[in-house]
From Swiss-Prot:
InterPro entries per the UniProt record, alphabetical: AdoMetDC_C, AdoMetDC_fam_prok, AdoMetDC_N, S-AdoMet_deCO2ase_core, S-AdoMet_deCOase_pro-enz
Active site: S63 (schiff-base intermediate with substrate), H68 (proton acceptor), C83 (proton donor)
Name this polypeptide is given: S-adenosylmethionine decarboxylase proenzyme
GO molecular function, one term: adenosylmethionine decarboxylase activity
Organism per entry: Shouchella clausii (strain KSM-K16)
Matching Pfam families: AdoMet_dc (PF02675)
Example of a GO cellular component annotation carried by this entry: cytosol
Length: 129
């Protein structure tokens, strides 16, 4: 069965703390990562937190790239999700890891839209009151 998309989740450790706290740098890296992967950038939104950290999203025609950075830990959580068979999300994720000088990169790729989740893998959450 064909997928509706590929979702790369990347845990980046040992990143350059100054880069992780530089919103303009991260924004440019993410736009460049999308373009290198062959994606079409639609919108860009990033936010710098006080005293540190950056979160942001690059919306692409094919889906999105996101980051949440934790400079105090040298850590960044990134997602690259692409719809369709043309764009390889790993190209963007690897570029981001290199630009942030990550010493460790743990990557998980999930095919999306493959049908119902198997019961043993489904998580149930009750409503919070």
């Amino acid at each position: 069965m064909d997928t509706m998309g590929r979702h790369v989740i990347s845990e980046l450790w040992g990143c350059d703390t100054n880069k992780l706290n530089n919103m303009e740098f991260i924004e440019q890296v993410f736009v460049n990562a999308a373009l290198r992967a062959g994606a079409e950038v639609r919108e860009v939104a990033f936010h710098k937190f006080a005293p540190q950290g950056v979160s942001g999203v690059v919306i692409i025609s094919e889906s999105h790239l996101t980051i949440h950075s934790f400079p105090e830990h040298g850590y960044a959580s990134i997602d690259v999700y692409t719809c369709g068979p043309v764009i390889d999300p790993n190209v963007a994720a690897e570029f981001i890891a290199r630009e942030l000088n990550a010493t460790t990169s743990e990557v998980l790729e999930l095919p999306r839209g493959m049908g119902p989740v198997k019961p043993e893998k489904r998580l149930s959450h009750s409503a919070v009151k």
